[in-house]
Structures are given as C-alpha cells and as structure tokens.
C-alpha cells in the first residue's frame, strides 16, 4: 500500500467512525459519559454498530456480554433488544458492575427486556451458567476472559449460536505495545489473542 492509499483508507475510516458516532443512541452516549467520568477508554462507534447489527441480523434473544470496560458494547446490545429478550452483563470489578447497574436503570425505561448484571470473575462464573441458554456471547476486556469463554461456548450456546471476540488484535489493552501487529508485544492480551487465534484456526 502506497502513501496515498494509506491516507485514503485513514480518511475513509475517520469518516465512517464520525458518522457512526453521530448515529449512536442516547443510551450509548450515556455509556461513554460514564466511562469518561472514570477515565476509562471506550471502544469505537463502528465496533458498537457492528455488534448491534449482528445481534439484530442473527435474531439472538439471549445475549451475554463479558468483560471489564464493556459498557459501550453492552449499551449497543441493549438498544437492539426486543421486549422478550434477555441480556446479561458480567464484570469482575465493583466499578464496572456499578456502571452497568446505572446504565441498566436508564435502559429499563426503554425496554421490557430482562436486564441482568453480575459482579463475578468470568473464569469462574461461566461454568455455573445453565447450558444451551444463549444465542450470542460477546467477549471483551481482560485476557483471561477469552479462553474461559471459548472453552464454555459449546456448552452455553444454543444451536447456531455465535461467540464474538472483540479486540482480537489486542490494541485496546492498557499495556498494548501495538498488539498483534507488533511481534515484540508480549503483553498478557497479545499473548492470549495469539493463543486464541491458534486454537480457533
């Protein structure tokens, strides 16, 4: 890719991201505000839009979002829920759990869907869930969440259910040194993502 092509790709991505951000529902903007109040980074608008689109297109009615700092992803899924749907958000930190509870108080005024937040370590919590109970699993946050979710997914997912791993390039973690694009990045997230890709492929 030459410099002109690179710059055009960058401009295109910036345009798409700006447009998607402008289209985000109020609940998602509230999630971003909560993240900013705690000086936590939030994901791109495009990632949130992709999750919302996938949830809608797949017809998933029972969704679980796993990961510390996944407030924006949770909000985007919440905005796409039907009244009979169920959303469970799992966060291992008291701070993240509190943020989700605040967000769900607002979401409860917008939907009749079942909203549940759990303050637990996903590596221990997932094994206690009922099997064959979810259509969609979204995995975010700490490196340890990914292998735990991958291991439990065959048991937890219904037929045709799907698991989505966010930040597979390991660029969003605080200790990222370029993630998978940098072979020298040996941070926990980068190492875990390399192992996950090897396991999946």
Map each language-model feature to its residues.
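A short alpha-helical cap/connector motif
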Residues: 1-136, 143-164, 168-201
């Amino acid at each position: 890719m030459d410099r002109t092509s690179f710059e055009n790709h960058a401009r295109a991505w910036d345009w798409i991201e700006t447009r998607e951000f402008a289209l985000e529902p109020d609940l998602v903007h509230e999630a971003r505000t909560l993240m900013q109040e705690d000086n936590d980074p939030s994901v791109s608008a495009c990632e949130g839009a992709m999750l919302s689109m996938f949830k809608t297109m797949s017809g998933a009615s029972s969704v679980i979002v796993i990961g510390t700092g996944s407030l924006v992803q949770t909000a985007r899924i919440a905005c796409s829920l039907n009244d009979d749907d169920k959303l469970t958000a799992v966060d291992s930190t008291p701070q993240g759990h509190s943020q989700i509870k605040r967000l769900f108080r607002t979401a409860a005024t917008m939907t009749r869907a079942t909203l549940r937040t759990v303050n637990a370590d996903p590596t221990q919590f997932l094994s206690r869930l009922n099997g064959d109970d979810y259509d969609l699993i979204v995995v975010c946050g700490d490196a340890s969440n990914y292998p735990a979710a991958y291991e439990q997914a065959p048991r937890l997912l219904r037929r045709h259910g799907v698991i989505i791993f966010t930040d597979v390039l390991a660029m969003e973690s605080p200790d990222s040194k370029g993630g998978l694009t940098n072979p020298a990045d040996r941070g926990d997230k980068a190492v875990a993502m390399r192992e996950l890709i090897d396991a999946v492929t």
